[in-house]
Amino acid sequence: LSCVPTLCLNAALRLQFADTAHFAFSGRLKRRIMPFFICLSAMNPLNLPQELPIARYRLHFTLTHDLQLPPYAASTLRGVFGHALLAAACTCDTPQTPHLPDCPYAQIFEPAPCADLPGSIRQSPPPPYLIETPLVAPTHFPAGAGYAFDLVLFGRARHSLPLIAAVFAQAFAKGLGANNAGKGELSGIAVQQADGSFLTISERGSPIALHDNHIRLPERYPTQARIQLLTPLRIQQ
């Protein structure tokens, strides 16, 4: 994909499907879990392909030093990832603003403007990755404990998994969290399967095994979806 046709939402969604079709909205939009319903065609309403170039991975680390993270750790992980990626993968001779189009750092972390995207995100396309941390999780992890988070890759970014994993390994080796004191070693990488389970594809720095990195879509779709908001959502338009 030359650009990533994705919409980044500041809300986590959980879908449940039912058989009957109607539209309903329950409750006012507040900071709490709240369901609402949307209508779907029983066939393929968007004429989607059989597969989408999306893969979800889980990165496991073994901590060598105590790690202290804020309640919502994804922002912290994104920050250390960006700094480590810039140091490891930027191919520009001098700092560029914006980076050159073929710079791996730019392709992953700061995508160039793309005319094929909607106007609201044309100049600043969403990056082709998402970092997902548990909504409810401890903030302190002692040395010797494990720490894991999910990484969703879109389009061509899936083929950069070895680079991205190596960059996260460098970030954890250097330190993150409070005072950059938390350190750890990458102990495993797993990919999510169609049934929701995770399959280990690398352990302790071993080469990443070949694996399916697509989402396969169903041939038929239910007529109703129930969406449960797990984080606050503000609908502007």
What label would you give each PLM region?
Residues L1-A42:
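Intrinsic disorder/low-complexity segments
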Residues L40-Q237:
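RNA-interacting cores
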